[in-house]
Amino acid sequence: MFQQNKHHQQQQQQQQQQGVVQSGVASATVNNPSESIVAGNIYECSLHGILSTPSSTFIQRAKGMMRCEHPVSYKEMVFKSTVQSAGPSWAEGSILPSEIHVRYEKNTVYVRYVGVPQIKDNINAMIRNVVDIKSSETFFIYLENLGYVKDYEYFVDGYQYSTYNLSLFLVNHRRVLNDGTKGELLNKHSMVELQCLSGEEGFVAAAEYLNTYAEYLYPFVELIKFDHRLLTAENSNTPTTNVNVVGGYNR
C-alpha cells in the first residue's frame, strides 16, 4: 500500500510539473474548412540560434539529451490577406489574421496560425500564440474566398529531437524552384530552435525550462530570445533587402 501511495504521489508531482510548462494542448481535424474551430489559448515559447559548429557534434549532444529523433521535411506556404476590412460580409464581426501558414508534410495539409510574437522583458523566451489544424486540399479554395493570396514559400528539411514537452529542431531552408522542386540552400548554416508549449500562466516556468536545456547545448550553439523589434528598428534605417532574416528565404 505504501509503495502504491508513493507511486501515486510521484505521478501527481510529474503531472503538476508538466502542467506548469504545458497547461493544455489544442488539436483539431477539419474536414469542412467552414466548420467552427474550438481551441484553447496555446502559446509556443522558443529560443533560436544558428549552428556554426560541426553538425555531427551537435547531433551527438542532442541525441544524448533527448528521448527520440525523427526527420522533418515539409513545404511551408505563407498566405497574406488582401482584405482591408475585418472580413467578408458573411463573416461580419470576425477578425481575419494577416497571415496564414499552410504546411505540406507527407501528403497531408496542416494549417497553422502564428500570432505576433510577444516580447516580455521579464521572460527570457519568444512567446507566440499558435493554432495547428489538420485540413485538406479544399482549404486552399476557402483561403481564396477569404481574400488570401500566396506571399512566399520555402522547403524545410532536418531533424526534430523530443523529450517530454520539449522539442529541438535542427533544420535547413531551401528555395522553391519554378517547377515546385527544391532549390539551393538559403543559409550556409543550419537553424536551431528549442521550443515548448505553454498556457498563459506558465510563461516564466516554460522560459526557465528552455534556458536550462539551452545551457546544456552551449557552446555547440547559442540559443537566445529573438526580438523581432530589433529588425524593425534596423530596417527603418536601412534599405529593404527583401530577405527574411529569421527564415532565411526571399520573397
Curated annotation (Swiss-Prot):
Family from the record: Belongs to the Mediator complex subunit 18 family.
Protein's UniProt name: Putative mediator of RNA polymerase II transcription subunit 18
Localization in the cell: Nucleus
Subunit annotation: Component of the Mediator complex.
Keyword Transcription regulation: yes
The protein's role, per its UniProt record: Component of the Mediator complex, a coactivator involved in the regulated transcription of nearly all RNA polymerase II-dependent genes. Mediator functions as a bridge to convey information from gene-specific regulatory proteins to the basal RNA polymerase II transcription machinery. Mediator is recruited to promoters by direct interactions with regulatory proteins and serves as a scaffold for the assembly of a functional preinitiation complex with RNA polymerase II and the general transcription factors.
Matches recorded under InterPro entries: Mediator_Med18 (IPR019095)
Domain of life of the source: Eukaryota
GO CC, one annotated term: mediator complex
MF annotations from Gene Ontology: transcription coregulator activity
Keywords, alphabetical: Activator, Nucleus, Transcription, Transcription regulation
